[in-house]
Amino acid sequence: MRLTLFAFVLAVCALASNATLAPRTDDVLAEQLYMSVVIGEYETAIAKCSEYLKEKKGEVIKEAVKRLIENGKRNTMDFAYQLWTKDGKEIVKSYFPIQFRVIFTEQTVKLINKRDHHALKLIDQQNHNKIAFGDSKDKTSKKVSWKFTPVLENNRVYFKIMSTEDKQYLKLDNTKGSSDDRIIYGDSTADTFKHHWYLEPSMYESDVMFFVYNREYNSVMTLDEDMAANEDREALGHSGEVSGYPQLFAWYIVPY
């Protein structure tokens, strides 16, 4: 009886040892990278990427990025920019959606909202301020072209968003309107948090889009539900909860 019990204990120990030594699956590796990004341990995440590439496991990085975007993690953009500025450009180019590279290289882009498929532009108003609107028809003129300039602070990346035609930056108004939303307009300077925006990636029906938030007010950029006479819609900073609704509040960022 003692011998049988001893053999049983040895068998259990052997199984435990084998489990400890078993190679980590790609799913486990992807989850480890995912969690490092979620909790903001970017140096650890970058080190994991280097390790996975040495092991020829680039698909693990791609899977982790996919999970981050599908779950709408804001840290995704911060992590990608950390890679971009710390000798990880090829990782971003190879394993992140193309939109990240387009934004980081400051290419000219268009912002098109998902809900209405309107392209963002600036238009003149009577008081000579330029107001942001979504254009219902124009998708090709320079009026709908923009450039993102990154600003890195405390491991967070923000962007100044400039109209390439008007050379003005998007800024959120100080004053709330009747619906508690704020007007978005153009400004020749970009020296306050009201001029800074951050991007939260999202995925809807396999499309990569972005919620565009203002740094000062944490309001998300959207278009008015009411149309003007020309079928354009005024751009607003919306203060309500939008998570989980990319089909209503997210934007495509595509090359111009």
Swiss-Prot record:
GO terms for cellular component: extracellular region. It is found in: Secreted. Pfam families: Lipoprotein_11 (PF03260). Residues 1-19 form the signal peptide. The keyword Transcription does not apply. Belongs to the 30 kDa lipoprotein family. This lipoprotein belongs to the group of structurally related '30 kDa proteins' that comprise major protein components of the fifth (and last) instar larvae and of pupae. This is Low molecular mass lipoprotein PBMHP-6.
